[in-house]
Amino acid sequence: MKFHLEVSLKLSGDAANAEGDLAEFFEKQAVDLLKKGAPEGMGAKVAGWRITGDQLEIKIESDRYVRAHDALLRLRKPLANLLGRKHRLGIRGINVSRFEIQIESNRQITHRIPYVRESRYEDGLLTLILGVEDPKRGWTWMLENRIPDRIVNLLEEKLQSYGGKAEHWELLWESPPREFKFSGDPTQEMVKRGWIKHGSARGQWIHGPQSTHLFRTFERIVLEEILVPLGYREMIFPKLDTWDVWKRSGHAQGVYPEIYYVCPPKSRDPAFWEEVIDYYKVTHEIPLDLIKEKIDYPIGGMCYAQCPTFWVFLQGATLPNDELPIKVFDRSGTSHRYESGGIHGIERVDEFHRIEIVWLGTKQQVMEEAERLKERYKHIFEEILELRWRMAWVTPWFMAQEGRTGLAEMEGAGTIDYEALLPYSGNWIEFQNLSVNGEKYPKGFSVKAQSGESLWSGCSGVGLERWTSVFLGQKGLDPDNWPDEFRKRFGEMPRGIRFL
């Protein structure tokens, strides 16, 4: 990887009298500064410089060890001290005339990358030429906010994805084989019996009394077997996630294709909307194009992962030692994901119901709680639901974004997927997960412990649609075929709604 940077520092006055001091600086001090921390023979170098009136023009060439933009930032402070102390000159701004990044690659990139004005591919080398896109955010902002580094990381991620790098999956435990009582599609059978009907939106279902009672039984099992015994407290998390929440949680790096966006109206004034109202009254049609003009930019999206909004409750706080670990859960509303062509029955939907379990504390507390949860889940799946299921370690979403996979890099953080076999398709489906997220959320939301010890957190989502798909897919809809322990908790089947 190579970098070439041509930059002009705007000074507060003519710098001709400073030429001698600058020459000495670039010949001695700058050389050491730009090699610091790099292997021998590596780093950055000033390939040329000159003074033109109140402009100090510098050319920097470098490798990956001291990138050119980092080299410039290393030079800025000592240059400011030299020019200010001896020549009463200040640095007023940074303007980049050329910034190239060259990286080895076996292909051209096919997608536009922000702040990349031009790209070319030749002889196994991919060259990116950077440019400023937002006039409000010039080169100083780009360099100080490490935009070039993020571009390099994004480029490496894309080149990796072109190679088809797969998610890591490692089997941890598998239940013994069990006899299945049903071999059909549970969703089709639920529709046939009037337990559920399609809602008006894609990937949405209306649950009748029978299906709802099944959901509530699963909820009660989770409460009685996990949440109450382990001391979890119930909260209500917001179901609208703003951009700031997703930036802090890390979801803003890649959530865009799957979220339902929320756009507020530009005005609450009824007169502003009168044209829309009148159009509908006359045509009985919704004027979507007109509405589009009257709504503002999205402020975020509908609930996607459920736990991120909880962290706003703790944001910026210092927690007393005796308050840890904190253990809470939320079951107050739906989550929404745009599944595109992947929707299928109640297994994969756009609107779903979930109990979100969150815990945080010291690393030891979080790891110990994860083990307790795993034991309780195993008890439920083995002794109450009697499922054919397995546990696997998979690459957590946040580690996948950072290009890390495998148990060797987990260092205590990681995700356990719980998968069950669907007899009608022969496929294993994820119906439950448990994640130890390390310091990610406490750091992202600036949550600290009184002791100064690093805080960790974990979360686990109980998806009621997935539990239903798996349970009915293996046991069927006839309660006589259900395990005794589950039937005790389920009780009587409620009467459904009849139609003529």
From Swiss-Prot:
Q: Where in the cell is it found?
A: Cytoplasm
The entry marks the following residues as binding L-serine, namely A305, R337, R354, I355, E356, Q401, N433
Q: What SUPFAM superfamilies does the entry give?
A: Class II aaRS and biotin synthetases
Query: Cofactor(s) for this protein?
Result: Zn(2+)
Keywords (A to Z) from UniProt: Aminoacyl-tRNA synthetase, ATP-binding, Cytoplasm, Ligase, Metal-binding, Nucleotide-binding, Protein biosynthesis, Zinc
Pfam families recorded:
tRNA-synt_2b, tRNA_bind_4
Which reaction is recorded as catalysed by this protein? tRNA(Ser) + L-serine + ATP = L-seryl-tRNA(Ser) + AMP + diphosphate + H(+); tRNA(Sec) + L-serine + ATP = L-seryl-tRNA(Sec) + AMP + diphosphate + H(+)
The UniProt function text for this chain reads: Catalyzes the attachment of serine to tRNA(Ser). Is also able to aminoacylate tRNA(Sec) with serine, to form the misacylated tRNA L-seryl-tRNA(Sec), which will be further converted into selenocysteinyl-tRNA(Sec).
Protein name from the UniProt record: Type-2 serine--tRNA ligase
Species of origin reads Methanothrix thermoacetophila (strain DSM 6194 / JCM 14653 / NBRC 101360 / PT) (Methanosaeta thermophila)
Name of the gene: serS
